């Protein structure tokens, strides 16, 4: 059984030994005589995201950018995610494309070898508060889906206010920024 918990700030953490022992004791009443209960920590893969967009004419690009960030926060709300759930880029792109003021989602050109509409990056620096787990997002991305590790793991947008970058690159009447 692979587990994780979260702290008061809803950031993923490994469960302490007391919680694991309580869980093991509770589950033992439902196991068969020959079964064993092994509780292990799942891996946390911290991510960031970059999205470029074209704003509709008449909309403030900064306000649209903030709305995109809010929608991305909702998409990556940890209560909506499970261990080993992949990130389907097209679902995220659709969610962001229906934000008021967004004309189009445009693939970032820098550091985007798969030319995806939204760039997902690995944030791993322990010194910056991340899990320390390094994960090759580009290698794990196939056909617009970011797959988790073969080891039980979960994607987490740990610091959404800094880990989400939304950049207006133009507007719907052809002005480039």
Per-range role (PLM):
Residues 1-177:
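Acidic, low-complexity glycine/serine/threonine-rich segments
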């Amino acid at each position: 059984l692979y587990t994780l918990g979260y702290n008061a700030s809803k950031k993923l953490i490994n469960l302490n030994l007391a919680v694991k022992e309580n869980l093991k004791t509770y589950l033992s009443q439902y196991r068969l005589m020959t079964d064993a209960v092994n509780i292990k920590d799942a891996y946390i893969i911290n991510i960031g995201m970059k999205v470029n967009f074209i704003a509709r004419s008449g909309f403030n690009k900064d306000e649209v950018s903030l709305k995109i960030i809010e929608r991305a926060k909702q998409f990556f709300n940890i209560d909506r995610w499970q261990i080993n759930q992949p990130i389907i880029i097209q679902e995220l792109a659709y969610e962001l494309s229906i934000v008021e003021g967004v004309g189009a989602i445009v693939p970032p050109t820098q550091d985007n070898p798969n030319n995806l509409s939204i760039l997902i990056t690995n944030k791993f620096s322990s010194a910056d508060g991340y899990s320390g787990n390094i994960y090759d997002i580009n290698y794990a991305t196939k056909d617009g889906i970011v797959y988790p590790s073969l080891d039980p793991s979960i994607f987490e947008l740990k610091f959404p206010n800094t880990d989400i970058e939304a950049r207006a690159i133009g507007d719907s009447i052809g002005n480039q920024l």
